[in-house]
Amino acid sequence: MIFAHDTEAALVSAAALVNTGGRDEEGLPNLIALDQFFRAHGWTGRREHDEAELRSVRALRPRLRRIWEVGEDEVVEIVNALLRESNALPQLVSHDGWPYHLHATPPDAPLATRMAVEAAMAFVDVVRTGELRRLRVCEYPNCGNVVVDLSKNRSKRFCEAGCGNRAAVSAYRARRAQS
């Protein structure tokens, strides 16, 4: 484990959220998709289950995506802004069978606020440990998805959308064509 469990979960969730704003189709087209995302990433707390909530979660994606695209100083600016705007107050909590971990918003805060702050708190750990190079963009041509590399040797190059398999098949075909 590179980071604490809650940090890794928040990083993976942030990347998954960013990747729902894909170039080809909307990954959160409706409230059902948001509900599925909420459950898949273990989110807890208040939900409005309305279009305004969906819009606010979608609006968070470009701000988070910038973190994968900029240098450390600008990452710090984005993270600090997310924490400041949400009046984040870090506290140790234990719930749903999880050991103590940090939350910086109350469980009744709006979902997009909780997502923003959880991501920001995770990025704090990434910056503090000098591990920003673990945040990458998928190397597969024309993909553009973001990647959180939690491998021990920082070797993850592709996103979770099958790009690694496509790259391996392309390399295999190229080798076969040369022989």
Task: Report each predicted region and the residues it spans.
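Short helix-coil boundary/hinge micro-motifs
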Residues: 1-149
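Glycine-rich loops and low-complexity Gly/Arg-rich segments
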Residues: 117, 127-129, 162-164, 172-173
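Small/flexible residues
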Residues: 138, 158-159, 175-178
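Cys/His-rich zinc-coordinating "finger/knuckle" motifs
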Residues: 145, 150, 166, 170
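Short, glycine/charged-enriched secondary-structure capping and boundary segments
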Residues: 152-154, 174
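Cysteine-rich micro-motifs
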Residues: 154-164
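Contiguous alpha-helical segments
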Residues: 167, 171-179
